[in-house]
Amino acid sequence: MEKFQGYLEFDGARQQSFLYPLFFREYIYVLAYDHGLNRLNRNRSIFFENADYDKKYSSLIVKRLILRMYEQNRLIIPTKDLNQNHFLGHTSLFYYQIISVLFAVIVEIPFSLRLGSSFEGKQLKKSDNLQSIHSIFPFLEDKFSHFNYVLDLQIPYPIHLEILVQTLRYRVKDASSLHFFRFCLYEYCNWKNFYIKKKAILNPRIFLFLYNSHICEYESIFFFLRKRSSHLRSTSYEVLFERILFYGKIQHFLKVFVNNFPAILGLLKDPFIHYVRYHGRCILATKDTPLLMNKWKYYFVNLWQCYFSVWFQSQKVNINQLSKDNLEFLGYLSSLRLNPLVVRSQMLENSFLMDNVRIKLDTKIPISSISRSLAKDKFCNVLGHPISKATWTDSSDSDILNRFVRICRNISHYYSGSSKKNNLYRIKYILRQSCVKTLARKHKSTVRAFLKGLGSGLLEEFLTGEDQILSLIFPRSYYASKRLYRVRIWYLDILYLNDLVNHE
């Protein structure tokens, strides 16, 4: 952000209050679609999705769009005329996509400035390893073995768009920008419904930003109450965005409850609480009794319904006892497993045996849900029996083999932290047999005849990749003893959920 502050012709105070003029500056569009700002996005920018502008940035589109924005009536297109209205070879959908991406970049400016100002004079530890999804599980292994219950809930998404717009009012003071954004947002959703059957590519950046802002509102209140009620003062709340009218909103929030503020804190008082969130799921682990966990459940339901005006069904909040129930989180089934140990102790001439029980976090692969995902992608049938991938038979043999091997390695990479590898071998078997049946179908042969003519080289492709990586990490003696297949391995380079997990 410091690199681009020279382009902004406002000082720090005016940037927060006057964002609307930035919509009419051409250099903002250049920054919004700069490859440096979009290198983390897996989709190419919409300027390069069109065949007419696939080689260079078109400033003509931006200039014509700015002229159109001076007259907002020209941006309003009836839904029935969306497909017929073209402007320079594009429909109005194309220009609303540009505005939505631009607004996401502009509105992030005051957020970035406030976040940077809150970090001034503080030393924050930066670690790229903490970005990995697998970094959560070592934390769970250390903490969850001492807890009894876990509160598992799905954070509700606001149904009405106006709730998301109201979230920005506490941070963006420019009324013109808010009105313009509200207008574009409703128009955006109108042609989103119109083009839903045509699978139009819609940039989700602005909706992701609004949803994260909505989550920050919820977590700021939760951590505030958590800090006030806890005996152990937590400092993790400092990484949240700076609040505007925060304490006034807290006072309004307290009016929802019949009891007073100390009574509410008394219900939530527990020094041993751990909170983990990823996307729309969050879990709350504690040593509380079932009664106190139900009070936490009551608190979350009232928080969303009374303060955020979002309907929240209590059925979406599950209270799991880790020693009996499985917790499905990030594609794993987690539970506590009792590991009995017998220790022999000798004192002088007397010896005796001591039975110790060690609690370990057991992480298993949800084979049933993954089998349904494989069946949905036509790798197997509903019973889990491998079938050929008919849509891939037009590709070359090497392309088919590389696709299956890549999927198999990604699954092995993601589920390497499983405590029981039998289900992982079952998934590999389904993919390997599906690959063989696909190649046999392409060559119009049987599986037996195809394997007999090809030899064992095909099956080795599914085994060499992961084993070669592990042999470079672990000592040769450890690798040769086959203990490697019984331990859990967490990788710190996994930034996205596996596609098979996203199906659920």
UniProtKB/Swiss-Prot annotation:
PANTHER family, per database record: MATURASE K
Annotated InterPro entries: Domain_X, Maturase_MatK, Maturase_MatK_N
Superkingdom of the organism of origin: Eukaryota
GO cellular component, one term: chloroplast
Annotated source species: Lepidium virginicum (Virginia pepperweed)
Function: Usually encoded in the trnK tRNA gene intron. Probably assists in splicing its own and other chloroplast group II introns.
Chief subcellular location: plastid
Compartment list: Plastid, Chloroplast
GO MF term set: RNA binding
Protein family per UniProt: Belongs to the intron maturase 2 family. MatK subfamily.
Pfam family, one: MatK_N
GO biological process annotation, one example: tRNA processing
Protein name: Maturase K
Keywords tagged on the record: Chloroplast, mRNA processing, Plastid, RNA-binding, tRNA processing
